[in-house]
Amino acid sequence: MELSFTKMQGCANDYIYLDCRTAGVPENIAALSEKLSRRHFSIGADGIICICAPRTAGADAMMRIFNADGSEGRMCGNGIRCVAEWLYTHGVQKEQLAIDTLSGLKTITRRGEGLWQVEMGAYSTLPADLPAVNMGGAPLVDVPLEVDDNLWRVTCINVGNPHCVTVVPDVDALRLEEIGPAFEHHANFPERINTEFVQVVDATHLKMRVWERGSGETWACGTGTCATVAAMTELGICPAGEDVHVQLRGGELTIRVLPGNELRMTGAAETVCEGTAEVEEKRPRPLRHGFAVPPLPKGEALAKLRTLPHCQRLPLWGS
């Protein structure tokens, strides 16, 4: 199967973008995302984003996100800026775009060359909106959470997808590959959760690292950055109504909390490359002589091995 793609990144949060507006999303999209996202062995990315025909009147397109493990996400802040940039450079040259997501319709405004502002919608701290269980019914702001026998103070935010935000003294000192999975798969979050670890520089400047469900540590996460600023506002650390600049491993995003808990994100979107991939369907592996070996039940396979002279002297068989 021949597949045309565009690789794009926002703050180094990179995805493979497929134009699915006419043909629709490939049936094997989950397996395809796993295969093509493998770094060093394939194109390499945080997942695949499909640009689809809109489902809402007045929308310009719909975005569907598939993580590197094949699971489907609901919203991606960095990804939606790249979708807007892709549409703008592929004939939809509007200064304001409307894009469908599984978290609702989002409005994106062009603010310069490759620079986009996204109205992300309102956030919620209620456990039912995450969802979160065994944490009561009150807003999840500065609550204790035991993770691998360690007690953390967390603020949980839904910004179209679920996030768990915690303040740490030094984000660079964290061993995210160890603690990230423990947060992601915590029993209190039945649909898993994204986790942001944030270091406060001052009231309008933060440093952040993120562990994304389904992808592991990524160099940036737009929704995670929004959740982080929302959490810091809830804690009284960052001011509402002002731009807060968040430094991630892949770059900087600017977030503002507006009245009604609405969030606005501004950041860049860039095309890395375009290309065509030849994706092979899985088949039985052929031998050099050109025929395939059919799979055998275990018992038959052992019986055939026993007939080979060089195997009969080996202690392989038991009773």
Residue ranges and their predicted role:
Residues 299-300, 317-318:
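Glycine-biased, low-complexity coil/linker segments
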Residues 113-117, 121-123:
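Membrane helix-loop-helix hairpins that form the core translocation module of multi-pass transporters
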Residues 67-68, 157, 296:
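Short, acidic, Ser/Thr-enriched surface-loop or helix-capping motifs
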Residues 124-153:
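Active-site glycine-rich loop that binds ribose-phosphate moieties when present
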Residues 290-292:
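Short hydrophobic alpha-helical segments enriched in small aliphatic residues
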Residues 1-114, 164-279:
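A glycine-rich beta-to-alpha transition motif near the start of alpha/beta enzyme domains, typified by
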